[in-house]
Amino acid sequence: DLFLSLSSAVAPEIGEYERSATALFNAYVGRVIEGYLQRMEQTLFDAGLKHRVLIVQSNGGLVAATQTIPVLTIESGPAVGVVGAAYLARELGRPDVIATDIGGTTSKVAVIENGSWNYSRETVINQYQLRMPMVDVTSIGAGGGSIAWVDGFRLRVGPHSAAADPGPACYGNGSDRPTVTDANLVLARINAARPIGSGLGALDPDAARAAIQTHVA
């Protein structure tokens, strides 16, 4: 069977180029995502799940796995993070916050005002402009594993990454390159004794400080 991607169903709006590009991206990722969701749903049902499997879309909403338009799940992870941050902010009585999602090589930022977030109708992926509703999230090309280095007299961060292994210098896995995580540890923004992450022991502030002093200080 062929996977059919119809532009009028994927992006039912004016804009021939954007609509076509969105339909093409949907066709490119559609078969893989569709198969994955089918296998996942069947596995969950076999394990005893008695409810529908719902998938988050890039606009922060939910849709049944069987009705998912694959391309509309792009940036669904950051989107649901913003939705969760807005809920937590309201519960804490702080409706105006900046939500940040820091990954290994990128960081994503969204503004939440009065408990609500903004939406964007378009996004650019690999220079292709796609038309889809999505939570307005700004990406920055630096994450927790991004390595800091000096270019002449300028401090730069990224694009190289320490990755998960060996990871930042403070992990104690043999790396001596300073990362964003090392900087946050030295600045006491991270609790060395209680790091977030499965399997991580206590972090080493001295190793982080030595890496910074050696390479960028």
What are the functions of these language-model segments?
Residues 1-217:
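N-terminally biased helix-coil "hinge/interface" segments that flank
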